[in-house]
Structures are given as structure tokens and as C-alpha cells.
Amino acid sequence: MTAMTLCLDRPGLLPRLSPHHLSRERLIEPLLASTARVKLLCAPAGSGKSALLTECLLRAPTDCRAYWLPLLGESLGVAEFQRRLAHTLGLSSSDEQTLLESLALLQVPTWLFLDDYCRVPNPELDRLLDRLLAIRNPLLNWWLGTRRRPQCNWPRLLLDDELYECEGRSLAFNEHDIELLLVHVAPSQAAGTARRIIQRSGGWCAGVRIALLDGCPWVAGEDKQERSAMLLDYLQHELFNTLSPELVEAWQVLAHLPRFNASLCEHLFGAGEGAKCLHDLQDMGCFIEPWEDSADWLRVFVPLARAMRDEQGSAGRSWHRRACQWFTAEEDWQGAFEQALLAEEFEVAVSLLQHFSFEHLFRRENVRLLLNLHERQGEELTLGSPQLVGLITAALLFAGRFDQAAVCIEQMVRFTPQPTAILQRQLLARWQAQQGWLLHLQGRMEAARAHFLEALAELGNDAWAARLLCLSGLTQQALLTADCDAALALNREALCLARAQGSLLFEGLLELDHAQLLEQRGAPRRAESLLADIHELLCRQADRPTPLLGRIALRRGRLALSQGQDEAASEFFQSGLRDCLHSQDKRALYGFLGQAQVAANQHDYALAFDRLRDAERLMQQRQIPDTVYRGVLLQVSSHFWLQQGRPQLAREALTRVLRHYRGPNARQAPPATLELIARIEYLLVLAETHLQQVKQPLERLKALLDHAQQHGMLALEAELQLAICEVADLTGEPALAKSALQAGLELVRRCHLQQALSELRLRQPTLLSRLGEEDHLTPSTLEANPLSARELEVLSLIAQGNSNQQIAEQLFISLHTVKTHARRIHSKLGVERRTQAVAKAKAMGVVN
């Protein structure tokens, strides 16, 4: 945001910055350092182009002449443009030849800024600009800010290293930038508020400013999208007023579509007209961008599309009906289903579900859409076939609505008997697979196992998806009983089947089981590497598998937390929680729990318990049975109470919850918390020891330790050794305390389990120093190295000054893979630049 002012040491009127301007060195420094003759800032309205150009102008060297020509986006004729340019330069003549000669003969360094170049197609003016930019005077630098990319010979400039370009995405604010602007927000709320503003604005500069002027309603933590009259007014003036009525209508229709391409536009707006409308909107910088980095699909910039969808009447059901017809003709069943729902053609939507499989549940927000359709239309519409019953049942189980799922499963009886005995057995086997998962999630292990095994015995090759689900359920049960060998064998069988069917979604689901196995065995780094790889593969999918990516992010957050990487864990928990909330996944619980644990690590127990209350509130709002969340919620709460010195609260809660997992009607722990029962038991021993209300605490802990050691559960073993140390210290056995501590520390070092040690320190801040171990725990011996072996190779080559291409050639991997490794390195080390990554790695001692 700029205004004009007279500057005595520069020719003419020059811009000045807004009092609210935020200087961003990461954008300015590369622009000023670039030796390219032409700097092009091409981005939609409100992207901060003028402000960035102004900052660069104000930093021009003292021996440099700087000229500022504000064009206001007007569609000027060539003669008028030449006149204005000549006037700015102080030339007496404005004919083209004089301009070209004068610029070519400049003898002093000159920076010429063209701000807000012509917004509408103007081929004649673009050709003149191309001739001006072709002047090869090394003393002349062009700085061009524009919404529309002019039709100039950019490839030639690029090949000659004479072009430096900034696009809209690079101009966006990041969370740190926004935190600096939140001067009216309490510091403790700044990070969360900045994150919410980013989510709603995409970092778009005008959107961020409007959010700040609207008063940031997100400070209260509400996720509701507020209508912004200011944003709509801005769009009217800066976008719609520059377009024809036909283009305005087309843009508003497209804003209501999740994705579109030229062919769909032809269907919607007429043959020969639709593709032209789309091209014009793209050419004029109307916030049209690639849909999730796709080469084939486009979308309207999400924050603006969301604002338009909130406005009633800007697009009718008829447009969605026509879009549904096009997607159906293209056999794009996902797009057709979404458009049928938006058109409120519910019977059509149900008929399209015949083309859906279980894999569709892990795409986008299909679970939410299916559940809404089921609730809105009732059983008559959505339970018309065994396949529909299976889809709705799976969606209900995914969301944690077990009672409704049980009712839904019972509907399978309506489709019996089948015409043949074989079909009857297949239908029964599918029922058993679904019933097995319901029982498994309810904690009824034996009954679930029987159903899984009987279903596997009957399910045919065409029912491979149901077979995979049974194998996954059996894998999780093996993990819950600490039978790691059986779990590994079952998981391998399932992965082989998923790969044979070419199902990357199922492979990702099964790799989550594999990662749990690795975590249980004390190999969090291998688990993280496994999940990072599958995450990368899934992100290349055309339809974003949001629910699966959410679960993977939460598991990676847990792994990062266990290794002492709180910053990375926080990012994973945030992204995973966002995806799980969006897709109605009951696993959103673990996003809240993870955030609570990160807060407790920072001694912010008020925030930690707030996140636990948020978790409980969500579970209750969604009517999820308390067997899903009560045990782990109280276990984490008890961790915090013990750290606060409140063992009585911990003892009461743990005693109560342990009853559910002991006795004749005992339930298994939820599949996402494999070692929940053992953790509850050792925390209860700790609480009772502090209260001096325990008998034989060390014997009880040693029994748990023996079980963990026998089954290779190294992560749990480390926690138990540290718990034995604490209890031995409290009961006056220093020798045992010291030996248990040393055994625990060895596991912490070997398996990178820094969180277990952090929790001991939070419970007993002076214990390590009293036992003489604090001095030995230097950062070099305990600091977690989050990088995989391949990432260390890449970082070492970066430290040697190699380019990405050179690294790819030396390691025999693709350039894309090198860039992916570099992004992961930056994320894990919490840095933005290569030099920062190298410096931090050297400080950690992982790179020489």
C-alpha cells in the first residue's frame, strides 16, 4: 500500500510506504542482489507488488537514478505510454526512436519502475514494452509490477539470465510476518492467531490486512468463517469493476467449483466461449491458480472462493447440475458426486455412489459428505444395496459413530438370501469384516478376531479391499498383544496385496500399522522415514487423500515428540488436526493430545489442559463413545498432574480408568494407543508411591519391564526403566535408582527417546543431578538428530557447496527427490535457507 510524495533527491513524485508496512528482507534482499536487468513482479491485486517495489526504490544506491512511473493499470495507447515515460525521464521528445536511443545511451546507473502495468490485454503496448526491455544497456534496470503477464519475449531474457521473477505465491505473508503485525494481540495468542489468518487468507497481503482491520475474530479460537463486507467490497472495486459482466458471472460460477478446466468451461459457458473466458481471466490475473499443483486442473484462490460461496445467489443450482453432467460424461465420479450434492440432486448423488469404493473414503471430505447425505436422506435412499451399506458403515466407523454403524450393519440382512450359495457366503463374509471392525474399535478383541478370521476364509479375490481391512485389524490386534512377529507377518501380507492391486491409498493405511510396529520396537527414525516417503507419494495423487494425510501427520507428530523435536511435532499436530477435523475423523483426538503434550513440555499447563478440554468437548459433540477417548485422555491428564505434584488426582483417575481394562469384561486399548494399559499401570504405581499408598511398587514395575523386554518393546522399556529409577529413589534404594537410570538413558540415546527423559525431568527436576548423571547429559550426547541417512548425505553435499543438480548426479537420484529431501531438512531443522540448515547441523554435530 503506497502513496505519492515529493522526494528532493530523486526526480519527480515518488511513492511512500504505508505506516502499517512490514519490511520483508527475505523478498527484498534477493531482488536487490540480483544482477538481472529486468525484475518482474507478476501477481493478482493486493499481493504487495507496489510496496515491494517501493522498498527497493528507497534502497537504490546513491549513485543510481531512480524513476517511478505509476500506470494505475490503465489500458494506454502506445503514444500516451510513450508520452508518460518520456515525461518521467525528462525527455523533450516522446517518439519511440528517441526513447530507445536515450535509454540505450544512458551513462549512469538507472532504475526505472513501472508500477501497475496495463491490466487488460493490449498487444500493441506489450510489443512496445518488449522492444524497450530488449535494450541491452547494462546500466539500465527495469522494475515491473503487473497483474497481467505482458506478451514479451520472457524466454529470451530468462535464458540470458536477464530476468528475475517474483510470482504471487512468493509474495505471500508467512506466519512469522503476521505475528509481527499482531501488535494488538496477546503474545501467547499471536502464533495461533497468525496460523488462523494464514488458513483463511492464504497469506495474501490484502486478505491479511482485511483480517486485521476486521478485528481478528479468530483470537477467541473460533473456526467459523466470518463474512467480511470489506473483502467483498475490495473484490468489487479491484476485480469485478475491471471485468465485463460476462467475465464477472463466469468468475463467480468458477468460484463455486472445487476445480475446473477449459473443457468444463466450454460445457458451462458455450463452445468457443468458455475456453476464451477462462483464458481471459487467467491472463488478467483474476486469482486463477493451479488446483493442488495439478497440470490439468485450475481453481479460484481458495480464500476468495470461500468468500463467494458464503454469499447467497451468486451461483445457482443449475450451474452445478450442468457441471455434474460434464463430470459424469467424463466418468469423473468424484467430481460428479460433489456437484450433484451442491445441486441438491440427492437421488443422482446416491446413484453415483455405485462407482465409489472404500478408497473413496480416504479422499477429500467424502466421509463428511456421505454422513450428511445419510442423515439428510435417510435409510431408504442410502441403504439401497450392500455396497451402499458398506460405504455408509465404513464412514460411520471412521467418524467414531459406533451405535449408528451397528444399526447400519444390521441392514445387510435385507439383502439375504442371495441367489446362489457362493454369493450368500460372500455377503456374509463382508458382514463379518464390518462387524469385526466394529467389535475391534469397541475393544472386544476375541469376538473381533473370530469375525476377521472367518471373513478371510471366505472372501474372494475380487473382495481384496475387505481382505486388506481384515488383515489390518488382525495386525493391530497382534500389536496390542505385543506379538510383534505376527504383526509384522500380517502387515507384510497386507502390503503385498495392496501393492499387487496398485492401491497407494491402502498402502498408506497399512504403512501406518507398520510405523506403529517400528515405534513400539524403539525405531522412531525408521518409522518417520517410512511415513515421510508414503506422504510424498500420496501428495502426488490427483485427489488429495485428506483423511489419510491427516492420520499420517498425527503419527509423525507423535514420532517427532518422542524424539524431542517439539517444534516439528507442533507443526505435524496442527496440520494433522486440521485435516482430521475437516474429514470428521475421530483421530482428531490425538491432535489435541499432542498439542497438550507440547504445551506441557514448555510448562504451560493452562494451555495443556485447555487442549484436553477441547478434545473432550469435540468427542462429546460428535457423540463418540467414551471408550474411544476416556482412557487416553485420563492417562495424559495424569502425566500432567504428576508433573505438577498432584498425585492424588492422578491416582483417582487412573484407578477408575484401569477397571475398564481389567476383569472378566475387560476391553482392549484403542488401536491408536498400543501401550495405553501398561502406561496407565506404571503411572498409577508412581502416583501411589508419591502418596505412600502402594505395596511392592518395584515388583509391579519389574513385571511390566519383563513383559516389555520379552516382546522387544524398547520404547516402553525406556519409560519403565526411568519409572523404576524414580520409584527406587522415592523408596530409598539409590543403587537401584542409579542402575535403572543408566539403563534408561542408554535406551534414550540408542532409540532417540528424548521425550521419556523430558517427562522424568518434569516430574523430578533434581533427580538426575542427585544421581550424578546431569553433567553427563550434554547436548551432543542427547540432542536428537532428526535427519535420515539419505538426508544427511544430501546436507553434507549442500555444505560442500554443491547445487541441487550436482547432488542429484552424485547420488544418482532425480532433481525432484533432491528438492524433496531439502524441504524435509529445512522442516526438521526449523530453518528456511540452505545456509541456516548447514549452520544448525554443524552446531548439532551431525555435519562436519
Model-inferred region functions:
Residues 54, 147-148, 232-310, 318:
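C-terminal boundary/linker of central alpha/beta nucleotide-binding cores
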Residues 103-125:
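Conserved P-loop NTPase "ATPase switch" module shared by AAA+ and STAND
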Residues 337, 357-358, 375-378, 410-420, ...:
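Amphipathic alpha-helical segments of tetratricopeptide repeats
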Residues 242, 289-387, 399, 408-411, ...:
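A structural signal for repeat-array scaffolds
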Residues 294, 332, 345-350, 384-389, ...:
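Alpha-solenoid helical repeat architecture
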Residues 39-66:
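P-loop NTPase Walker A phosphate-binding motif
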Residues 801-836, 840:
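Recognition helix of helix-turn-helix DNA-binding domains
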Residues 53, 149, 165, 183-233, ...:
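Amphipathic alpha-helical "lid/sensor" segments that cap RecA-like P-loop NTPase cores
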